[in-house]
Amino acid sequence: MSQRWRLATGGCINRSRPLRFFFNGRVLTGYEGDTLASALIANGIRTVARSFKYHRPRGIVGVGAEEPNAIFQVGEGRKTVPGLRATQVELYEGLKAHSVNGWPSVEFDLYAINDLIGGLLPAGFYYKTFMWPRSFWKRYEHRIRQVAGLGWAPDA
């Protein structure tokens, strides 16, 4: 397996045990002992998320619990878990991870238009703008949460 961004030797991984995993629908490979973050970096994945308000590209910048950007939805269906940091998820065979705040994808995010119209979006604008009509709040709330990219609850 050729991973351009991985050191040829060293590290705390078992190079004799490759693992296949999925990130945003793409099949990638890593090794036993990798974290999701280290495997993504080794595979050359640089943009893993988008910023909350302006949807600017974000990459992995930390190595532990302090990582602010690489927060994913891991698993599917009833076993999905939102809000996991890639630096704290140990890679396993068949792992499925999804970015939570880029639409239709983190590479091409249509909500990045917010960066261009940022001057029209003061802090907290969504709390003041979407107050009426009151009956529409459920629709507004769903869309605001989707744009913020906070993940979704497991299926019942």
Residues covered by each model-derived region:
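Terminal leader/tail segments of proteins
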Residues: 1-17, 38, 42, 47-48, ...
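Short secondary-structure capping/turn segments at boundaries of alpha-helices and beta-strands
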Residues: 7-9, 25, 58-59
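Residues in flexible loops and secondary-structure boundaries
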Residues: 15, 29-31, 36-38, 80, ...
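N-terminal amphipathic, basic-rich helices that act as targeting or association modules
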Residues: 22-52, 61-71
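Fe-S ferredoxin-like electron-transfer domains
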Residues: 52, 57-156
